[in-house]
């Protein structure tokens, strides 16, 4: 099982998301919705650290097993809004925010920070295809530097990996990473 993490400095934490025109008012949760829908691994989970207020940072946890009902950006927004408002949802929310993320990250290794200035992906193929990695990225903005440093100190660092010379959106990066990992899943499925 793998974990995909989006750190959103602007993601709204209270669930007050309009049904239409939600990109701006939601603090760009649409970026997280597209990242969720881009992940191809069936046993993965997406965790989004929302830091845009009005409540303190919160961790939205969205298992890919919900994809049967979450098939679009809009349906992601509906589920996220329900979870953030404490209503019944296939997503969950942890109000401990940063500490909840650190605790979740401790269960996965290696912890890979997907960064433009990271090492070449081809040099880290073994880590990328390990059985329980975490892939961490920013949303439409880079994660706050102080937060990354705090997490690195508490977790013993991150492996920084770049997927190439282009500046890509989070959903494109997650699509690429999960597509590269798919042959590994196909092989393990065939042997069972």
From Swiss-Prot:
Its EC number is 2.1.1.257. InterPro entries: Alpha/beta_knot_MTases, TrmY, tRNA_m1G_MTases_N. Keywords: Cytoplasm, Methyltransferase, S-adenosyl-L-methionine, Transferase, tRNA processing. S-adenosyl-L-methionine binds at residues 114, 138. Gene3D superfamilies: 3.40.1280.10. This is tRNA (pseudouridine(54)-N(1))-methyltransferase. It catalyses: pseudouridine(54) in tRNA + S-adenosyl-L-methionine = N(1)-methylpseudouridine(54) in tRNA + S-adenosyl-L-homocysteine + H(+). Specifically catalyzes the N1-methylation of pseudouridine at position 54 (Psi54) in tRNAs. Belongs to the methyltransferase superfamily. TrmY family. GO terms for cellular component: cytoplasm. It comes from the Archaea. It is found in: Cytoplasm. GO terms for biological process: tRNA methylation. It is an enzyme of class 2 (transferase). GO terms for molecular function: S-adenosylmethionine-dependent methyltransferase activity; tRNA methyltransferase activity. Homodimer.
């Amino acid at each position: 099982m793998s974990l995909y993490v989006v750190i959103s400095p602007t993601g709204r934490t209270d669930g007050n998301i309009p049904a239409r025109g939600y990109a701006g008012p939601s603090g760009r949760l649409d970026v997280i919705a597209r990242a969720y829908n881009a992940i191809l691994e069936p046993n993965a989970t997406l965790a989004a650290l929302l830091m845009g207020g009005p409540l303190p940072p919160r961790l939205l946890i969205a298992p890919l097993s919900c994809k049967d009902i979450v098939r679009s950006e809009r349906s992601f927004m509906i589920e996220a809004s329900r979870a953030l408002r404490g209503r019944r949802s296939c997503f969950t929310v942890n109000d401990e925010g940063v500490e909840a993320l650190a605790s979740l990250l401790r269960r996965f290794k290696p912890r890979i920070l997907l960064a433009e200035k990271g090492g070449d992906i081809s040099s880290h193929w073994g880590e990328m295809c390990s059985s329980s990695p975490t892939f961490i990225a920013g949303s439409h903005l880079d994660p706050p530097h102080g937060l990354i440093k705090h997490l690195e100190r508490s977790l013993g660092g991150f492996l920084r990996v770049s997927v190439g010379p282009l500046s890509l959106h989070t959903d494109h990066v997650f699509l690429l990473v999960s597509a590269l990992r798919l042959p590994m899943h196909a092989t393990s499925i065939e042997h069972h």
